[in-house]
């Protein structure tokens, strides 16, 4: 067990704990005997899981990187030896649409966290890890890129990370922090979000393998990346903070592959060979033997500025602490595709709550093995009730439906009819609304949740969100953009297909919508390269 002065276990604080990297880092730290604290944003998809006992050794705290006061409150109330700063707005394409938000979270968020640690006098005791990116190098850097390669970022995301990199190094030099920047090249896994291109590829290949899709679209097939496995990289991250002094390290495989290579490797897992024809925007991938077009290029998915040749060298990390990647591209892609095939078969491909790794599945007799610190305004278990707005409906004292099969912590079913209107006075720039649709529960009712950030308060004059959802059938996969119908005001009614047409397993889908300053709806695709300005008005759904 990792201990401090043989008196207590080591303790770590992780921002971004519910993301891909956070999940693997938690696995590593718990195995080494750490006590783990994590920062989570109080959204509905997390609240549902926080109603369950967590794995031993994990304590979660509500907050985000834009709130210095909450960070101060959390870090002054716990004893921590290592801080792993993983939280970020990490979509490159999204950063072109939201540069201010991206810099607020990534750049200023890092400064807020470092300044809180400095004010608390922890600069000599706490070791700090900052997760930066190979996107720092831009598109002109010679390959391979190392810690000494000049940085020339070409996206708002990369610019925000350059500030994060520089301010971390500055606090190391100016205030004596044991602080390290991890310049991590692309790293993927089955836990990668479905909005990233690699996971988009593996989920679509899985759907094709299961007969639920015919083809899909991608952007620049020529873009080259150095892809590794998140588990390998998080082991390297932990090793960085065990060194006598803080420094900056590149973690990379040293092998470059194109998006086209990744596609071929994914189809190879399901026994399909892809043959390419055409060039640039006219290029397509065809299945050898059947002639079916499986991949098309859509220029809408191109980034405004593309880093086409990122290739890293981890020579410094190998020399300093012996780090080397264990996964090859082929073994990484195989693990991802096989995992996604299982998710398709289980009906959970588009689950918005991929947090099973947090839950203690061995907990019995109601024993609580976790702690969740939250403010009164963000209580785990809050749910939306059409009759009286928001109320607490947690494991104890929750309002139950007539059907006792509704699990504890599950949000209450949608009543016969719920009308959701755009919120009044939405600030310019939009407001995200995330909807969890859990299909039919055992009572045969649709379950709906709203994100905590969209919870009505005393200043609201309406409820957020404009969306209608269709029930999935045995022949209709739950694909987010296929199931969204939007208008200025839409009613949601429970779907009424016979039980035989609904898959027995739970199905979920994440439907993200933006309402702009004029109350119009912006469609957000479940892919990284959406167009944020596109306004849509689709027909009102026909209710059963």
From Swiss-Prot:
Question: Does Nucleotide-binding count among this protein's keywords?
Answer: no
> Which domain of life does the UniProt lineage start with?
Eukaryota
Q: Where is this region: Disordered?
A: 366-406
The alphabetical list of record keywords is: Antibiotic biosynthesis, Lyase, NADP
Which GO MF terms are attached to this record?
Answer: GDP-mannose 4,6-dehydratase activity
Broad class of enzyme this protein falls into: lyase
- Family matches, as InterPro entries: GDP_Man_deHydtase, NAD(P)-bd_dom, NAD(P)-bd_dom_sf
Q: Which residues form the signal peptide?
A: none
- Which reaction is recorded as catalysed by this protein? GDP-alpha-D-mannose = GDP-4-dehydro-alpha-D-rhamnose + H2O
Can you supply a Gene Ontology BP term from the record? Answer: 'de novo' GDP-L-fucose biosynthetic process
Bias kind Polar residues: ranges: 368-381, 389-404
Its pathway is: Antibiotic biosynthesis
Residues reported to bind substrate: 90, 157, 186, 192-200, 219, 225, 303-306
Q: What is its EC number?
A: 4.2.1.47
The active site lies at: 135, 157
Swiss-Prot/TrEMBL cofactor(s)? NADP(+)
Instruction: Give binding positions for NADP(+).
Output: 16-21, 41, 64-65, 86-90, 161, 187, 192
PANTHER family of this UniProt entry? GDP-MANNOSE 4,6 DEHYDRATASE (PTHR43715:SF1), GDP-MANNOSE 4,6-DEHYDRATASE (PTHR43715)
Instruction: State the protein's purpose.
Output: GDP-mannose 4,6-dehydratase; part of the gene cluster that mediates the biosynthesis of sordarin and hypoxysordarin, glycoside antibiotics with a unique tetracyclic diterpene aglycone structure. First, the geranylgeranyl diphosphate synthase sdnC constructs GGDP from farnesyl diphosphate and isopentenyl diphosphate. The diterpene cyclase sdnA then catalyzes the cyclization of GGDP to afford cycloaraneosene.
Record family assignment? Belongs to the NAD(P)-dependent epimerase/dehydratase family. GDP-mannose 4,6-dehydratase subfamily.
The family database entries (HAMAP family) matched by this protein are listed as: GDP_Man_dehydratase
Per its record, how is this protein called by name?
A: GDP-mannose 4,6-dehydratase sdnI
Q: Which organism is it from?
A: Sordaria araneosa
* Organism lineage: Eukaryota, Fungi, Dikarya, Ascomycota, Pezizomycotina
């Amino acid at each position: 067990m990792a201990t401090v002065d043989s008196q207590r276990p080591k303790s770590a604080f992780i921002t971004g704990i519910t993301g891909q990297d956070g999940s693997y880092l938690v696995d590593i730290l718990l195995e080494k005997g750490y006590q783990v604290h994590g920062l989570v944003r109080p959204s509905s998809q997390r609240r549902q899981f926080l109603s369950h006992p967590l794995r031993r050794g994990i304590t979660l705290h509500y907050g985000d990187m834009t709130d210095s006061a909450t960070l101060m409150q959390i870090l002054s109330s716990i004893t921590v030896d290592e801080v792993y700063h993983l939280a970020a707005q990490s979509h490159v394409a999204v950063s072109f649409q939201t540069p201010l938000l991206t810099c607020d979270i990534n750049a200023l968020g890092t400064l807020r966290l470092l300044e809180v640690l400095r004010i608390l006098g922890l600069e000599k005791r706490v070791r700090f890890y900052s997760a930066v990116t190979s996107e720092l190098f831009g598109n002109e850097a010679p390959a391979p890129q190392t810690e000494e390669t000049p940085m020339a970022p070409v996206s708002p995301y990369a610019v925000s990370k350059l500030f994060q990199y520089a301010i971390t190094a500055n606090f190391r030099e100016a205030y004596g922090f044991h602080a390290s920047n991890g310049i991590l090249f692309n790293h993927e896994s089955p836990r990668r979000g479905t909005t990233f291109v690699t996971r988009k590829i593996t989920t679509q290949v899985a759907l094709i393998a299961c007969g639920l899709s015919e083809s899909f679209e991608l952007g620049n097939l020529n873009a080259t990346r150095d892809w590794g496995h998140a588990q390998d990289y998080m082991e390297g991250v932990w090793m960085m903070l065990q060194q006598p002094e803080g420094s900056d390290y590149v973690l990379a495989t040293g092998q470059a592959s194109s998006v086209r290579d990744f596609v071929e490797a994914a189809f190879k897992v399901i026994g399909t060979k892809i043959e390419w024809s055409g060039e640039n925007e006219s290029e397509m991938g065809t299945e050898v033997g059947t002639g079916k077009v499986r991949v098309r290029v859509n220029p809408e998915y191109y980034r405004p500025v593309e880093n086409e040749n990122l290739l890293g060298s981890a020579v410094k990390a190998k020399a300093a602490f012996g780090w080397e990647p264990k996964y090859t591209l082929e073994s990484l892609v195989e693990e991802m595709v096989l995992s996604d095939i299982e998710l398709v078969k289980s009906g959970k491909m588009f689950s918005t709550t991929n947090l099973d790794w947090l839950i203690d599945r061995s907990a019995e007799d109601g024993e609580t093995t976790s702690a969740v610190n939250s403010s009164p305004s963000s209580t785990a278990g809050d749910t939306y009730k059409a009759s009286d707005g928001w109320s607490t409906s947690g494991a104890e004292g929750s309002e139950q439906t007539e059907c006792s099969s509704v699990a504890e912590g599950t949000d209450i079913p949608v009543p016969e009819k719920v009308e959701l209107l755009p919120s009044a006075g939405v600030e310019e720039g939009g407001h995200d609304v995330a909807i969890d649709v859990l299909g039919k529960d055992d009572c045969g009712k649709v379950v709906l949740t709203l994100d905590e950030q969209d919870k009505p308060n005393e200043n609201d004059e309406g409820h957020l969100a404009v969306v209608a959802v269709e029930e999935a059938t045995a022949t209709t996969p739950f694909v987010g953009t296929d199931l969204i119908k939007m208008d200025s005001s839409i009613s949601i009614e429970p779907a009424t297909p016979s039980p035989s047409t609904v898959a027995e397993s739970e199905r979920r889908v994440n439907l993200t919508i933006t309402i702009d300053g004029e109350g119009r709806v912006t469609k957000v695709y479940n892919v990284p390269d959406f167009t944020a300005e596109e306004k849509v008005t689709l027909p009102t759904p026909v209710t059963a």
